[in-house]
């Protein structure tokens, strides 16, 4: 069984537990992530979970979804509009549709070859990478809803997948901005949610990043600015990376400003 299937399912269940407590009005409340609402976030996740699953099990459906999205964009319409068209529900019904499909997807992918190549919007990806990307999307977009509700997310060792994705996109974070990639990854010394020590990179070559793995994951997914974390960063290469990290595909995105994304000071 691919370990990432269990981790993806757990990520879905953690977010679903939070969403089950939302009332009708909260589903249309803007979050700190580009003012997206929980409805918009869940439509986005479900739309592209379907696409990822179809890329493996129904390639013609995947290609049709991709081409429809591109045609929508060529007409000058937003992806949020497109996602609302193809995922035409909201609130509790949307939660049920998203969670049921995502958990079913995790089950369907258990026995796949993790090295199998599958199509995506850009270059092909391995099954393992595709599933990790879906977990990362769930975790990163879910952060906006946890922040909106003033809650801390229960983390676990599943976070390592997102940390590794952040490490593996060190080069991408530079390339997407047209910068040369430094020859060496900074040394990372990260503390996992259960006190684990996760280390990457060579000592004494390109600086160092020390701190909580959760903070590192928030920086590479752009859910927090570096200054809103407790990460300790030494060296020019390490600091430039942490100020511009981007572990997801697409065009270069500007990370949030200091203080822009944070946990709301409220309960419920």
Indicate residue ranges for each PLM-predicted region.
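Short, helix-capping/interhelical loops that line the mouth of catalytic, cofactor-
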Residues: 1-3, 50-111
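An N-terminal domain-cap segment
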Residues: 1-43, 52
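Acidic interhelical loop/turn segments
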Residues: 20-31, 102-131
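Amphipathic, well-ordered alpha-helical segments in soluble domains
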Residues: 11-18, 48, 101-104, 108-111, ...
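Hydrophobic packing residues in well-ordered alpha-helices of helical domains and bundles
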Residues: 5-8, 95-98, 131-134
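Glycine/small-residue-rich hydrophobic helix-like segments
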Residues: 177-220
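Short, contiguous alpha-helical
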Residues: 29-72, 120-176, 216
């Amino acid at each position: 069984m691919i370990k990432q299937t269990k981790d993806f399912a757990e990520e879905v269940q953690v977010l679903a537990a939070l969403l089950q407590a939302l009332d009708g009005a909260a589903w249309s409340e803007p979050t700190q992530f580009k003012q997206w609402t929980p409805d918009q976030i869940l439509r986005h996740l479900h739309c592209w979970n379907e696409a990822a699953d179809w890329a493996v099990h129904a390639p013609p459906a995947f290609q049709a979804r991709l081409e429809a999205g591109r045609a929508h964009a060529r007409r000058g319409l937003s992806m949020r509009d497109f996602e609302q068209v193809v995922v035409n529900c909201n609130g509790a019904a949307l939660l049920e549709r998203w969670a049921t499909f995502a958990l079913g997807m995790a089950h369907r992918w258990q026995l796949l070859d993790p090295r199998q190549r599958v199509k995506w919007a850009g270059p092909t990806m391995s099954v393992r990478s595709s599933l990790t990307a879906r977990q990362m999307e769930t975790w990163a977009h879910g952060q906006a809803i946890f922040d909106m509700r003033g809650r801390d997310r229960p983390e676990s060792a599943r976070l390592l997948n997102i940390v590794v994705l952040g490490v593996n996109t060190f080069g991408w974070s530079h390339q997407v901005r047209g910068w040369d990639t430094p020859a060496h990854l900074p040394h990372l010394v990260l503390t996992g949610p259960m006190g684990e020590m996760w280390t990457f990179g060579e000592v004494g070559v390109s600086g160092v990043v020390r701190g909580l793995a959760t903070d590192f994951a928030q920086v590479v997914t752009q859910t927090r600015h570096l200054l809103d974390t407790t990460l300790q960063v030494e060296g020019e290469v390490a600091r430039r990376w942490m100020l511009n990290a981007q572990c997801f595909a697409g065009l270069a995105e500007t990370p949030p400003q200091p203080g822009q994304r944070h946990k709301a000071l409220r309960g419920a």
